[in-house]
Amino acid sequence: MRYADPSANRDLLGNRTLLFIFICAFALVTLLQQILYGRNYIKRYFEFYEGPFEYNSTRCLELRHEILEVKVLSMVKQSELFDRWKSLQMCKWAMNISEANQFKSTLSRCCNAPAFLFTTQKNTPLGTKLKYEVDTSGIYHINQEIFRMFPKDMPYYRSQFKKCAVVGNGGILKNSRCGREINSADFVFRCNLPPISEKYTMDVGVKTDVVTVNPSIITERFHKLEKWRRPFYRVLQVYENASVLLPAFYNTRNTDVSIRVKYVLDDFESPQAVYYFHPQYLVNVSRYWLSLGVRAKRISTGLILVTAALELCEEVHLFGFWAFPMNPSGLYITHHYYDNVKPRPGFHAMPSEIFNFLHLHSRGILRVHTGTCSCC
């Protein structure tokens, strides 16, 4: 019979106790470091909240820095970006005039919306051989008939409007109650004939000054306006006197159907103006955002309108711009506020566009609204 040394059991028990104490101490130190220094600043969510913090407070400077230090979207997990953005909502937003003016000066040099957003008789004279944006080998000869459709000059000038709202169609708008705030803007841009019926007005408003129309909508929903002219006209009437904006010279397929829009409105004696994006403006805007990391086959119409608004308006507010399946609180949302139809994969770079908007918000250049509104 072997003799069992009781001291060996005591040594083993002692070693286990020391190991357990070490693990607990390590866990406690790690937890304290996370609370005191961690990126999420857990104490923010539990301290007594007395309302929005001032824009230039130390807390808000730190929160904005947390967004701006993320140079590319792939640097952080999506949930981490959401946490940082959600924390920043504790801060009042204010326009940084020097940052905004510097950014607008850059846009003026590269793109110049007040002179080239639309084709006009001034920037596209009679006889011009106009190059398409995408079909660069294609040329459209500006004849007398088309020339008469163009306005003599741009109808808008630099910083003409004090406060503008650019309204995207994202599901983030659903239940936002932002309609009154959107309607309170001096000028409102909307994308691609979105529904603004009574069912949606509390969230998206009704005021519209410019609405874009993608020619693919005309082709698919209105049979290229070869027969369905009155239904198309009735849809446009919803936007009252809003100007209609089309990419007629994006590619050769867009031109005829875009020109038909002008004919339809003339036939029904509509007061609505019809404008066409200048293809060189679209090229310049795409190049500019490519330099900031937006790599896509085509930038979105929303991004084009935001770019133009930054030159035409003193203060720009974005609504309905969000490119993720969840809102900042982690709740799943539909792709659009009116349906859940997904976009063609790989065509736009929406997450990259939204990421740039969050940066511009943090720099005080524009304001991105992703929560509920409490206007007026």
UniProtKB/Swiss-Prot annotation:
From what superkingdom does this record's organism come? Eukaryota
Give membrane topology per the record.
Answer: Single-pass type II membrane protein
Q: Which GO terms describe its molecular function?
A: alpha-N-acetylneuraminate alpha-2,8-sialyltransferase activity; sialyltransferase activity
The places in or outside the cell where this protein is found are: Golgi apparatus membrane
Annotated pathway, please? Protein modification; protein glycosylation
Q: Which ranges does the record mark as transmembrane?
A: 18-38
What reaction gets catalysed by this protein? a ganglioside GQ1c (d18:1(4E)) + CMP-N-acetyl-beta-neuraminate = a ganglioside GP1c (d18:1(4E)) + CMP + H(+)
Catalytic residue positions: 348
Q: What InterPro entries does this protein map onto?
A: Glyco_trans_29 (IPR001675), Glycosyltr_29_Sialyltrsf (IPR050943), GT29-like_sf (IPR038578), Sialyl_trans (IPR012163)
The name this protein carries in UniProt is: Alpha-2,8-sialyltransferase 8E
Q: Which organism is it from?
A: Pan troglodytes (Chimpanzee)
Which gene is this protein's source? ST8SIA5
